[in-house]
Amino acid sequence: MGGETKVFTLAEVSQHNNAKDCWLVISGKVYDVTKFLDDHPGGDEVLLSATGKDATDDFEDVGHSSSARAMLDEYYVGDIDSATIPTKTKYTPPNQPHYNQDKTSEFVVKLLQFLVPLIILGVAFGIRFYTKQSSA
């Protein structure tokens, strides 16, 4: 690897996306893995599906061994222009009213504990009052 390191855009790397010409972007570096497709333990489809994008997460999620990481050096062809890689947008949930669900249900339980006995007492007095008037 003498001389200057070649810098590729993601568009350039994306053109190398088939079994006869397969390039990957992993950790800011570009690798030509065409010769490795047949030897890859996970099959060539795994590598081909990672073309045209930053495949760093795909590579890291598998948990490659240190020997697999060392193997990357022999397929290195240059670096990626990081400005050409789309930034990942972090998911932010929509704003919702702030209320505590636990406190709301706790309030309802206390309210029912107070109201149910009052309603029962009111019904009992109503029945007694009604039956007293009808017998008189």
Swiss-Prot record:
Topology with respect to the bilayer: Single-pass membrane protein
Transmembrane feature ranges: 107-127
Residue positions binding heme: H40, H64
Superkingdom, taxonomy of origin: Eukaryota
SUPFAM superfamilies, A to Z: Cytochrome b5-like heme/steroid binding domain
GO MF annotation list: heme binding; metal ion binding
Known tissue expression: Is highly expressed in developing seeds, moderately expressed in flowers, and is expressed at low levels in the leaf.
First-listed, main subcellular location of the protein, grouped into a coarse class: endoplasmic reticulum
Domain Cytochrome b5 heme-binding: 5-81
Swiss-Prot/TrEMBL keywords: Electron transport, Endoplasmic reticulum, Heme, Iron, Membrane, Metal-binding, Microsome, Transmembrane, Transmembrane helix, Transport
UniProt cross-references to Pfam families, sorted A to Z: Cyt-b5 (PF00173)
Gene Ontology cellular component list: endoplasmic reticulum membrane; intracellular membrane-bounded organelle; membrane
Intracellular or extracellular location(s): Endoplasmic reticulum membrane; Microsome membrane
Family: Belongs to the cytochrome b5 family.
Function recorded in the entry: Cytochrome b5 is a membrane bound hemoprotein which function as an electron carrier for several membrane bound oxygenases. May play a key role in the modification by desaturation of fatty acids in the endoplasmic reticulum, which in the developing seed is utilized for membrane synthesis and in the developmentally regulated production of large amounts of storage lipids.
Protein name in the entry: Cytochrome b5
UniProt organism field: Nicotiana tabacum
